[in-house]
Amino acid sequence: MVCALHAVPAHHRRVVTPAGDDPSGPAGSGDRAVAAAAERAKLTAGRNIPSFDDLPLPADTANLREGANLSDALLALLPLVGVWRGEGEGRGHDGDYRFGQQIVVSHDGGDYLNWEARSWRLNDTGDYQERGLRETGFWRFVRDPDDPSESQAIELLLAHSAGYVELFYGRPRTQSSWELVTDALARSRSGVLVGGAKRLYGIVEGGDLAYVEERVDADGGLVPHLSARLSRFAG
């Protein structure tokens, strides 16, 4: 049973992030980030996600050197493909906390990217404390032949383990950063009550994946919720 279905208010639909929190960095940083990622790939190039080899269709791969070729429709998202691990900071109803996270971005040659993010809370000494947020979904590009302006619009469809599904829309900001905002959100009867969100992802100096997320609070305003910097582990 769906208990809530609503869009983010129109005046919240443009992401405005302070310069100091912008993962995309200054002009030209995208080229440097891609070059740094290529250097780091020498250490991670031999790793990939495990797969079974007895299915009659292409296997998922998080390594662009292995498996099916990435669809041409996804070239603007190519830097995201891989396995990413690191730490971040969150803000919940019980205050601020630190978390560890792994994000797996893979594909099978289709016109979408698979997305899985798992996190765990850390204690004061940086050790595992408890399970955290988890989400899975798909990145796609909008295809509307009647509206050419939508050719670079991104769809991100997510299902959250906390009991809600979320549809984001956004666009690439640069060749290595992407900006998205919640367009619709549906909560199950047992799901947590949350507001819509804005996310900014970017490949930053050193080839890391960084992001910030703001969510709408009970008063209708955007407040900081999550931020993290993750290093490439595979791909």
From Swiss-Prot:
InterPro entries according to UniProt: Calycin, Nb(III)_bact/plant, Nitrobindin, THAP4-like_heme-bd
Reaction it catalyzes: peroxynitrite = nitrate
Keywords for this protein: Heme, Iron, Isomerase, Metal-binding
Broadest EC class assigned to this enzyme: isomerase
UniProt EC number: 5.99.-.-
The record's free-text note on cofactor binding: Binds 1 heme b group per subunit, that coordinates a highly solvent-exposed Fe(III) atom.
Pathway(s) this gene product operates in, as recorded in its UniProt entry: Nitrogen metabolism
Similarity comment: family membership: Belongs to the nitrobindin family.
Its biological purpose: Heme-binding protein able to scavenge peroxynitrite and to protect free L-tyrosine against peroxynitrite-mediated nitration, by acting as a peroxynitrite isomerase that converts peroxynitrite to nitrate. Therefore, this protein likely plays a role in peroxynitrite sensing and in the detoxification of reactive nitrogen and oxygen species (RNS and ROS, respectively). Is able to bind nitric oxide (NO) in vitro, but may act as a sensor of peroxynitrite levels in vivo.
Name of the molecule in the record: Peroxynitrite isomerase 2
Naturally occurring in which organism (per UniProt): Mycolicibacterium paratuberculosis (strain ATCC BAA-968 / K-10) (Mycobacterium paratuberculosis)
Organism placement in taxonomy: Bacteria, Bacillati, Actinomycetota, Actinomycetes, Mycobacteriales
